[in-house]
Amino acid sequence: MLLPFPATMISEVEQPKEKRSLSSEPPSLMSLPYEIIENILARISKWSYPNLSLVSKSFLSLLSSPQLYKTRSEIGTTEPCLYFCLESANHSSPQWYTLWMKPDETLTGTGTIHDYSLIPLPSSSPVLRTSTVAVGSEIYVIGGHFNRSSSVRIFDCRSNTWRDGPNMTVARSDPVAVLIDQRIYVLGGREMDESDDWFEVFDIKTQTWRALPSFRAGLELRRYIVWPNRYFPRLGDSQTAVRLINVNPNALEGKLYVAAQINDYTYEPKDDTWKVVSKSSIRRVKVWCVIENVMYACHDVFLRWYDYEDRRWREIQGLEELCYHPTRGFSGAERIVNYGGKLVVMWRPVQSDGKDKIEIWCAQIALEKRSKDEIWGKIEWINSVLTVPKLCDLCYSCVVVSI
């Protein structure tokens, strides 16, 4: 015959369970090995990092670690991020910003999406947009603006810090910098009688500069002043003749693309040769970039792409609202860039409600080639991101960094 347990015995048996349940806590993420935590955070969109950094000091330290960004690069989770700076009316150091657009968002109806993060950054010396180039997670600012300089400033987008890079072989003012195969090619920024110093290259791996033979470019190019998007009269010219070339800020099929007064040229880095590719220049484009070996530009108020076979600019279809909107329509893009295979456009609207202030707008556009001579654009994200004085120059520099 089984006898019931005494109450005291039952309490003695159950008591440890109660104590155990009261003292047990859910496992913490920080209890995991450091490598596992780092791998988890590296797979999360950087859009979430500002909020995650508020969780604890340990999270803040992890999210600021250079090793985390190295892991993101190794496992292929880096994301594009837009960096731009604005010049004030008094020509003081421009203010740098980073713009993060929330991923996987689309424009619906007639409204706009407000999911973005605009963060002011430490500034450096004044720069011209064409002398700024993105290399991985870093931004190189090359040469001087108003005065010549051989200096190179490098901004590390992971730590938000500036440092000095190796100086160029000669001092330059407002040169053009283009990245091709982990080398930065720099053109111009010299006087006409110094055309032998017109061209040099920086090897990112060895961190060294090397002058390139300028004579191979020919007088057609070297007689022009590299002054993109501006008309600059030559001193001493009685008729103030315009000497201008326009250099595409992106490589085209691994080559440098230059539009001069009469002809268009390409430079092949592999054998150091220049070649005339067109007798009819496309120099008049205002701003341009390259996406999947197709040139895109703001030309005659519209966003266009270049048809190489027909040698003509064609309008990107489907962007009528962007061009003709009554309040945010634009008379021309201030800057366009390749944003991870999509087109990002920055502009000031044609009309502005404020007397002394203007809004800076930004749009992300997906591109689709539907036929041999037709490319369509779809606005995936659009918003006013900043309000500035009217005297402020928009997009003094604009680059996309992978981070």
Curated annotation (Swiss-Prot):
Xref: PROSITE patterns: FBOX
Kelch repeat ranges per the UniProt record: 138-182, 184-229, 248-294, 296-340
Tree of life domain: Eukaryota
Limits of the F-box domain: 26-72
Pfam families: F-box (PF00646), Kelch_FKB95 (PF25210)
Disulfide bonds: none
GO cellular component: a single term: chloroplast
Keywords of the record: Kelch repeat, Repeat
Name of the featured protein: F-box/kelch-repeat protein At5g39560
